[in-house]
Amino acid sequence: MDKKKDISMSVIKRLPKYHRYLGNLMRNDVDRISSKELSEKIGFTASQIRQDLNCFGDFGQQGYGYNVSELYSQMCNILGLTKVYRTVIIGAGNIGQAISNYIGFEKLGFELRAIFDINPKLIGISIRDIEIRDIDYLGDYLRENVIDIGIICVPSNNGQKVCNILVKNGVKGIWNFAPVDLIVPEDVKVENVHLSDSLLTLSCLLNDIE
């Protein structure tokens, strides 16, 4: 969707929360909801909700509100959840194994195709019937298989090296858990998850309370 290029990142960051809450409403058989009611559940202002959704089209009707199932379907389209994304994990340590074992991602359309690691003790072990491969063969695997997203779960000193291999072999999406800011071409999208950043944010908030 070309229009996304003009949408602020702050709006895009809020979309998964809309998706999650709308899914919960559907499971609870809620057919329609006003922006005010959604505001009370999701924690955004009603005005913010209307502005966010208007970025992608006219979804609500005055006096009626939003049709929950239709809005959920549109949110899936906006988030790209109508396709299947082929993924690989590089780094089978604690974080890599936790992601590998989480089946919720597959329900959203993110299929795990392969896992790679440098540790001889891990190579050959299977996680959910996917055998951990030697990272030396990552490039060969990517040349032989189309992969959409690479999930980097390696130490910071290897993060950029792994990223370079992914980019060189056509991977356009990187979910980065390595504590390093990656350098990538403009056509490659990176989502960083620096766990310590989140924890330090919490510690700052706690410190402010005290």
From Swiss-Prot:
GO cellular component labels: cytoplasm
Residues annotated as binding NAD(+): G91, A92, G93, N94, I95, G96
Disulfide bonds listed in the record: none
Keywords, ordered alphabetically: Cytoplasm, DNA-binding, NAD, Repressor, Transcription, Transcription regulation
Molecular-function GO term, any one: DNA binding
Single biological process term from Gene Ontology: negative regulation of DNA-templated transcription
A Pfam family hit: CoA_binding
Keyword check for Repressor: yes
Record feature DNA-binding region, as residue ranges: 17-56
Keyword Metal-binding recorded: no
Compartment annotation: Cytoplasm
Assembly notes: Homodimer.
Function field: Modulates transcription in response to changes in cellular NADH/NAD(+) redox state.
Entry similarity comment: Belongs to the transcriptional regulatory Rex family.
Name of the protein in its database record: Redox-sensing transcriptional repressor Rex
Organism: Clostridium kluyveri (strain ATCC 8527 / DSM 555 / NBRC 12016 / NCIMB 10680 / K1)
Lineage: Bacteria, Bacillati, Bacillota, Clostridia, Eubacteriales
